[in-house]
């Protein structure tokens, strides 16, 4: 009984603490328009590295959801979240077999960030050699908060949907 009461109190306090960190929710998708010439869109491969800078709008980065719609049956998509100084805050891996079995899937982060500070997430691939990426950020970033998008250190145009 006491243990149950303690758990309820902890859950309540955690809920109150998180409540202060939610700002206005926005939805932004970034990526490439796959209706244009294929040669103008970089294909995924072992050496592909995609980086997206962004500026946090509130105290919790609720979710970065990165998905690719077409994919191989082996390998993984790796995402690393770093601060402006290059310190790694979190790393996630999504095996391709999960993508194949469940359709386009993504990787999420729920992490505290400092409002207005610059962060970067980097996407790399291991064992994937096919289609094009569609990168999405759900309830966390607005157009003004997005920084440079690069593929293999080359700047890319961002498409906002």
Named regions from a protein language model:
Residues 1-86, 97-118, 124-161:
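Beta-sheet-rich sandwich/jelly-roll-like modules and their strand-loop junctions
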């Amino acid at each position: 009984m006491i243990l149950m009461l303690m758990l309820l109190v902890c859950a309540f306090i955690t809920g109150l603490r998180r409540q202060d960190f939610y700002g206005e929710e926005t939805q932004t998708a970034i990526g490439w328009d796959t209706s244009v010439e294929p040669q103008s869109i970089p294909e995924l491969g072992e050496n592909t590295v995609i980086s997206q800078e962004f500026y946090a709008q509130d105290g919790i980065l609720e979710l970065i959801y990165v998905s690719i719609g077409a994919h191989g049956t082996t390998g993984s998509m790796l995402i690393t979240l770093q601060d402006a100084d290059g310190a790694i805050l979190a790393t996630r891996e999504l095996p391709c077999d999960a993508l194949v079995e469940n359709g386009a899937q993504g990787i999420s982060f729920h992490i505290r960030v400092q409002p207005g500070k610059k962060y970067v997430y980097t996407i790399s691939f291991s064992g994937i050699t096919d289609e094009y990426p569609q990168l999405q950020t759900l309830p966390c970033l607005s157009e003004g908060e997005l920084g440079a998008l690069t593929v293999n250190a080359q700047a890319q145009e961002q498409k906002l949907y």
